Amino acid sequence: MTIPAYKRILLKLSGEALMGDDSYGINRDVIERIVAEIAEVNQLGVEVAVVIGGGNIFRGMTSSAEGMDRATADYMGMLATVMNALALQDAMRRAGLVSRVQSALRIDQVVEPYIRGKAIRYLEEGKIVIFAAGTGNPFFTTDTAAALRGMEMNVDIVLKATKVDGVYTTDPKINPDAERYQRLSFDTAIAENLKVMDATALTLCRDQKLPLKVFSIFKAEALRRVVMGEEEGTLVEV
């Protein structure tokens, strides 16, 4: 049996990924397929942590641009990530996976508070840990939360699951001649503003030498190929 390239990963899922082709909310078929992909790598012995966004329900930055106080909007966005985390946990339960949700905002009747030691123990026990509510602070994105939790969990790599199969020189939806990077440095991604992640998240990963892989969650078995070290998506490293 081939050994996975990574022992412990952090998967960053955007809220938009849960929508599928819908305009809002959570598409059941999509979330079940994502869970099936996570189950496959978990069964390979890979320890999986997940940071989930909330843009399918509420986007703080957009609302602040429309006149809402930015901090208030960001807290609402954090609550949206808790809703997504619960939906993901429920789908995992139905698929026979054992998971735990830890939130950076305390909602004790619904989810556990974030406690680093417990999260690491859950991972070591083979449970999937879903991190909700970002960093718990406004003005920080869930991408930054993914970088932060990745470092705290001592993961081997952060995997950013998107709708695009990697990082391109320009937007491939606009420019059909855009070329996909196979490998990319953090410095280049930051300097050229390639929209891989926000600059704070990229800088954290760069400074801690934590590699990042960007791939499409909508490509069948792409997550497994990434975990096995096969050529898939774009690798961003120091």
UniProtKB/Swiss-Prot annotation:
Pathway: Pyrimidine metabolism; CTP biosynthesis via de novo pathway; UDP from UMP (UMPK route): step 1/1
EC identifiers of the protein: 2.7.4.22
Domain of life: Bacteria
GO terms classed as biological process: 'de novo' CTP biosynthetic process; UDP biosynthetic process
Keywords per UniProt: ATP-binding, Cytoplasm, Kinase, Nucleotide-binding, Pyrimidine biosynthesis, Transferase
SUPFAM superfamilies: Carbamate kinase-like
Chain positions recorded as UMP binding sites: G54, D74, T135, G136, N137, P138, F139, F140, T141, T142
GO molecular function annotations of the record: ATP binding; UMP kinase activity
An example Gene Ontology CC term for this record: cytosol
Pfam families to which the protein is assigned, alphabetical: AA_kinase
InterPro entries, alphabetized: AceGlu_kinase-like_sf, Asp/Glu/Uridylate_kinase, Uridylate_kinase, Uridylate_kinase_bac
Catalytic activity: UMP + ATP = UDP + ADP
Activity regulation description: Inhibited by UTP.
Positions with a binding annotation for ATP: K12, L13, S14, G15, G55, R59, T162, Y168, D171
Cellular localisation: Cytoplasm
Subunit details: Homohexamer.
Role this protein plays: Catalyzes the reversible phosphorylation of UMP to UDP.
Family: Belongs to the UMP kinase family.
Protein name: Uridylate kinase
Organism: Nitrosospira multiformis (strain ATCC 25196 / NCIMB 11849 / C 71)
Lineage: Bacteria, Pseudomonadati, Pseudomonadota, Betaproteobacteria, Nitrosomonadales
